[in-house]
Amino acid sequence: MSSAASFRTEKDLLGVLEVPAQAYYGIQTLRAINNFRLSGVPISHYPKLVVGLAMVKQAAADANRELGQLSEAKHAAISEACARLIRGDFHEEFVVDMIQGGAGTSTNMNANEVIANIALEAMGHQKGEYQYLHPNNDVNMAQSTNDAYPTAIRLGLLLGHDALLASLDSLIQAFAAKGEEFSHVLKMGRTQLQDAVPMTLGQEFRAFATTLSEDLARLKTLAPELLTEVNLGGTAIGTGINADPRYQALAVQRLATISGQPLVPAADLIEATSDMGAFVLFSGMLKRTAVKLSKICNDLRLLSSGPRTGINEINLPARQPGSSIMPGKVNPVIPEAVNQVAFQIIGNDLALTMAAEGGQLQLNVMEPLIAFKIFDSIRLLQRAMDMLREHCIVGITANEARCRELVEHSIGLVTALNPYIGYENATRIARVALESGRGVLELVREEGLLDDAMLDDILRPENMIAPRLVPLKA
């Protein structure tokens, strides 16, 4: 192919540019590529967003066809293009950086141009022959970036929501399974990193499952509550300028059918076009889950510390050598990675919050950053949960003897004995144990405060880890 044949000429209100001949995007996308070399993350990095854009364009085309605004031939060609995008074709043509000025116009035009050029080829024309089917006049008919783009973001989040929930649920089940496996392993609970009272390792892991189950329940209800109201049909600022009065209801109805999502028109299109509150709340829920995961990973790192000089109550699966200078060292790399993912999600939430606050009057032009951060948080969170489950949780084993040893040598054990030997004896035993380094049980036996049968009964896991009626003394 000659140099001249490697490009096609396109023009817009700013002039003429040479667009790569093989590209399905057009001149406005090319300008955005040249303008926004920022994150290095293109729209195609988030396939559900691309699919959401294609579904919005399909719904708009269907509504415009039904209203007689779009010819049958153009509708058929646009429909073919959108179907291919929904199947996963041509995603590499979505090349605009996720961070961009213009309130998402570059993303919207990237979609309009790609769909137009796929449609043109389906009609037997060449890319760029927009006199036959135009990115703005036909693909973007009755739309503005300000309603098509936020609708696509919401839809993309909904389309990916089930996968996020599935990953979270699988992680919960993994923790619950370990809770059952370790239900007989007695260990010391700790508060403020100090010995507290006995519990089982199973209780500890079941608590991990329970706290994440709370978030699973909230996420299941939050997304449908927050993301199903769309402003499609509001066009530029929510007034619906340049759209048929019947268009909004038709377009949203078609989008709900195409996507399988229970989408409804926003009650107030002006408000829905300018307010980003739904994204703030949803991102906050992702942050909450990330915070919980990070805390759990802190616990896993502490409980596995050592192996000779730490707590060493559990063993994490060895994933890779841990040091270039210390032979034999193995680090808790999976929990450490999850910690870092959590920090990133927390940072994403703050950036998103600032972007939501940065809106002015009838539009929030910072929506590209909002989209970037929320899709990034979902991807990171889902991958982190899968990694944690597959490469860490399912392979955790308990050091039962170590757990028992720490219980028997812990000063905290005296709390369980207090109802039987009395507060003064318990206080004295604790002091002597601390001063001498001897174990609580050893001292109790030495002083004859309780016999072995009574101690064995008190120290049974089922008697140590739950409320128990203590016989009253005469």
From Swiss-Prot:
Its EC number is 4.3.1.1. GO terms for cellular component: cytosol. Coiled coil: none annotated. Induction: Up-regulated upon growth on canavanine. It is an enzyme of class 4 (lyase). Keywords: Lyase. GO terms for molecular function: aspartate ammonia-lyase activity. Residues 322-331 are annotated as: SS loop. The active site is at S323. It catalyses: L-aspartate = fumarate + NH4(+). One of its GO terms (biological process) is tricarboxylic acid cycle. PROSITE patterns: FUMARATE_LYASES (PS00163). InterPro entries: ApsA, Aspartate_Ammonia-Lyase, Fumarase/histidase_N, Fumarase_C_C, Fumarate_lyase_CS, Fumarate_lyase_fam, Fumarate_lyase_N, L-Aspartase-like. L-aspartate binds at T105, S144, T145, N146, T191, S324, K329. NCBIfam families: aspA, PRK12273.1. Belongs to the class-II fumarase/aspartase family. Aspartase subfamily. Lyase involved in the degradation of canavanine, the delta-oxa-analog of arginine, allowing growth on canavanine as sole nitrogen and carbon source. Probably catalyzes the conversion of L-aspartate to fumarate and ammonia. Homotetramer. This is Aspartate ammonia-lyase. It comes from Pseudomonas canavaninivorans. The lineage of its organism: Bacteria, Pseudomonadati, Pseudomonadota, Gammaproteobacteria, Pseudomonadales.
